[in-house]
């Protein structure tokens, strides 16, 4: 077997060092599942949340290791915001389903499928199936009405939701959204 050239060896060492740095201090998906999501009722959801959080944190660390700035930093932040928003949206769904099971949902939004309150909500035999048909906006409103989250967190989540929705490029252009490091930090803080 032919030995690797010094350039290949150096390149591999560099890649390994960046990978070690990116993984340092973020925990494994299994650790994140236990540390951050043990309150989530659904086992599959808990695992998916931990994997998504791991990916977002790993991208953050990778951006640090590569000293990402400008367009590269914007790309890193965009993906992190989308992931943090997805985590928040899923956590709200889980908490709403748990509150529904306990009969503690408040307000009237939870009785309607849409935020305009035109289509009655049919929770049916499996509330998890019903909740999957709702929007992030609906989940924020129901959570706030039910006291699951306060108005400050609801405002932060609406901001994250709007940033996440700029995955639709025409909306990004229309809204004039520019991704910057603080945006990912705020999304991460709201998720916590």
Where are these regions (language model features)?
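Charged alpha-helical initiation segments
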Residues: 1-78
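Alpha-helix N-cap/helix-start motif at coil-to-helix transitions, marked by capping-box chemistry
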Residues: 50, 54, 130, 154, ...
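Residue-level detector of well-ordered alpha-helical segments, enriched
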Residues: 76-83, 91, 156
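Short non-catalytic regulatory patches outside canonical folded cores
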Residues: 89-155, 174
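Charge-enriched, short contiguous segments at helix-coil
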Residues: 144-192
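Glycine-rich, flexible loop segments associated with nucleotide phosphate handling
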Residues: 72-81, 128-133
């Amino acid at each position: 077997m032919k030995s690797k050239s010094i350039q290949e060896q150096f390149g591999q060492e560099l890649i390994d060092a960046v990978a070690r740095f990116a993984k340092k201090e973020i925990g494994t998906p299994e650790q994140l599942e236990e540390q951050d999501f043990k309150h989530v009722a659904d086992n599959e959801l808990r695992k998916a949340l931990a994997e998504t959080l791991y990916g977002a944190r790993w991208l953050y660390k990778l951006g640090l290791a590569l000293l990402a700035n400008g367009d590269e930093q914007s790309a890193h932040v965009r993906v992190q915001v989308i992931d943090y928003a997805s985590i928040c949206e899923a956590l709200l769904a889980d908490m709403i389903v748990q509150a529904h099971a306990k009969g503690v949902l408040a307000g009237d939004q939870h009785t309607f499928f849409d935020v305009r309150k035109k289509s009655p909500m049919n929770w049916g035999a499996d509330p998890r199936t019903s909740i999957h048909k709702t929007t992030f906006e609906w989940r924020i409103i129901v959570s706030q009405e039910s006291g699951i989250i306060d108005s400050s967190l609801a405002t932060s989540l609406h901001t994250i939701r709007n940033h996440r929705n700029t995955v639709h490029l025409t909306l990004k252009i229309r809204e004039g959204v520019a991704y910057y490091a603080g945006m990912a930090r705020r999304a991460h803080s709201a998720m916590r």
